[in-house]
Amino acid sequence: MVGSESGFHPGVLLPDEYWVFDFTKGPNSNWRCPFDYQIGRYDEYRPGMYTTDLFSGERDLHVGLDIGAPVHTNVYAFADGVVYSLGINPEAGSYGPTIITQHELRLPRSVDSMELNPVRKFWVLHGHLSTESLTMVKVGSVVKKGELIATIGDEKEN
């Protein structure tokens, strides 16, 4: 996760040790992760993982960054922004309770570059949250970098 050295706040405060999943070989239902905190990689080919009706077996590319953590772990705004939307996505395989934040940022043109791109809008989807998280913010609310905006939900909520 992006840390304070970049000017961003971590979305979840990770311990020193956590697991980074490799789902490129498909799911293994017999294996259990030995760590309480885990990362699921962005832009990863994941064969056989999206089997619910929501995806109709047609998806195999993961387009987000997953952070696994114990239930009720705090979730923070990574940058200043606004709550764009919130709600519950109840379909099997979907996000469950979800908050989307909108941010306007100037990011470097490349890694290690001091030259910045123009201001661009970004939307961050915070999914698999606790249902109570939907009462912690309101659509249109301003959020500040590092502000508590949600907590991780349990499996029955997601």
Language model features with spans:
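Short, solvent-exposed loop/turn segments at the edges of secondary structure
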Residues: 62, 94-96, 158
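Polar/charged, compositionally biased leader and regulatory segments
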Residues: 1-72
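Conserved beta-strand positions that form and line the central face of beta-propeller blades
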Residues: 66, 125, 151
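Zn2+-dependent peptidoglycan hydrolase active-site motif and core
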Residues: 77-136
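Conserved, short, structured surface segments that act as functional micro-motifs
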Residues: 99-103, 139-158
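Short, flexible loop/turn elements at secondary-structure junctions
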Residues: 25, 35-43, 69-71, 79, ...
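Generic structural motif
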Residues: 67, 73-83, 143-146
